[in-house]
Curated annotation (Swiss-Prot):
It comes from the Bacteria. Its cofactor is Mg(2+). GO terms for biological process: dUMP biosynthetic process; dUTP catabolic process. Belongs to the dUTPase family. It comes from Polynucleobacter necessarius subsp. necessarius (strain STIR1). Pathway: Pyrimidine metabolism; dUMP biosynthesis; dUMP from dCTP (dUTP route): step 2/2. This is Deoxyuridine 5'-triphosphate nucleotidohydrolase. Keywords: Hydrolase, Magnesium, Metal-binding, Nucleotide metabolism. The keyword Nucleotidyltransferase does not apply.
């Protein structure tokens, strides 16, 4: 198993470190490290601290902050930036851009599970400028070109 360096920035998080919900879970649950409940109005976006910093270190990996499916489906709470990309050399606090895309207010409680952190392999590439691409069966077919739009 790959290891991930984590720094506790708020002592309350020492007993609330991210965990996998099940043995098959891909994401570690991130919690809202806040002093009191936050009310998020419809259409509002707030930046929520996690009280943690991570250091991926290995440039072959990156961490991604993703929404929790239940919060999105049942309460319309998603990420304001849709996906949070944490580069391997970033060492600052993990913050969760939290957007209420729904029509009712949402009350975020202290230490509530808010998002999930997934670590995945990535590959940096070297750009190669060409005049034409080698032909493929799809070509430049875009949205809906391989089925129903």
């Amino acid at each position: 198993m790959q290891s991930l360096q984590v720094k506790i920035l708020d002592e309350r998080m020492r007993d609330q470190l991210p965990t996998y919900g099940t043995p098959g879970s891909a994401g570690l649950d991130l919690r809202a490290c806040i002093d009191e409940a936050i009310t998020i109005a419809p259409g509002q976006t707030v930046l929520v601290p996690t009280g943690l910093a991570i250091y991926v270190e290995d440039p072959r990996y990156a961490a991604f902050i993703l929404p929790r499916s239940g919060l999105g489906h049942k309460h319309s709470i998603v990420l304001g930036n849709l996906v949070g990309l944490i580069d391997s050399d970033y060492q600052g606090q993990l913050m969760v851009s939290t957007w209420n895309r729904g029509s009712t207010t949402f009350k975020l409680e202290p230490m509530e599970r808010l998002a999930q952190l997934v670590v995945m392999p990535v590959q940096q590439v070297e750009l190669k400028v060409v005049e034409e691409f080698t032909e493929s069966s799809r070509g430049a077919g875009g949205f809906g070109s391989t089925g129903r739009a």
